[in-house]
Amino acid sequence: MDTFRNGDLVFDVTDAGPADGPVVVLAHGFPQFKDSWDEVITQLTAQGYRCLAPNQRGYSPGARPSRRRDYRLPLLVSDLHALIDASGADKVHLVGHDWGSVAVWAYANAHPERLASLSPMAVPHPAAFLKALATSNQFFSSWYIYAFQTPWLPERIMLGDGTQWHKLSKRLQDSGQTRRNADRDAQRMAQDGTLTAAVKWYRAMLLGNPKSFTTRTTVPTMFFWGDQDQFCKPAGALACGNYVDAPYRFERFYGGSHWLPEEQPDLVSKLLLEHFANYPV
């Protein structure tokens, strides 16, 4: 399939690998798209896995509602659920990066019975992240989350008059992305209201139920974190396993930035394959 639906919304999706292979769903983060997983997908499909990577809510042109409330976390979870149902699989391996990690943590807590394994990258369990916000320098590293609550400031900071995508590209490069990947993502963010839609993930955060963030995860989990990540600091990453009531493995990438799937796709793929093999569908 190249699209799937959740209600009236239509999502673009990469569907690669053997149709009868174990299913892996990969959820991208901000400000990226499904092709941020391409190098990982190539290696997973070579080992017989079927990989599904959607352009998520706000990133797919056919799934770009205008209201902030339409980007609440339960709705992001429902998008993943619709994709997993559309795959025909009873259970899948679920992988996320950045905001995709936030979504997959929430999915694992809502629908653990549909998952064989969970593999979030960069963003730890939400309870660990929230505690780090309150007790460490994570608060200062997350300044942009607070700035993104304003109606126009993030767009102005990142795109200037709306066409100056190089501003965003420079910020991404400063955080460890290659110039090629940063230019690619920034140019797409400058098109057709994409940035405003993507930022609504942040703006809808305050509309959620805080208690849902403290639910303990019961799915076998491997958490990936680069110790040079400028956005997700050690306090939350190192505490992540405290909130997982299942087999847990922490993979620290020494010298790794925030952008692990594209920065180190070979190692990411190797570790994912090990994790999947330990918890087969």
Labelled PLM ranges:
Residues 1-10:
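N-terminal cap/lid segment of alpha/beta-hydrolase-fold proteins
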Residues 6, 18, 262:
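Conserved strand-loop elements at the edges of beta-sheets that form or border functional pockets
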Residues 20, 125, 255-257:
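Residue-level detector of flexible, active-site-proximal loop/helix-junction positions
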Residues 16-63:
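Conserved HGGG/HGGXW glycine-rich cap/lid loop of the alpha/beta-hydrolase fold
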Residues 256-265, 269:
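Catalytic histidine-centered segment of alpha/beta-hydrolase-like enzymes
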Residues 5, 14, 254:
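Residue-level detector of conserved, well-ordered beta-strand and adjacent loop positions
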Residues 9-11, 31, 36, 52, ...:
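Flexible "cap/lid" subdomain of the alpha/beta-hydrolase fold that forms the substrate-access gate
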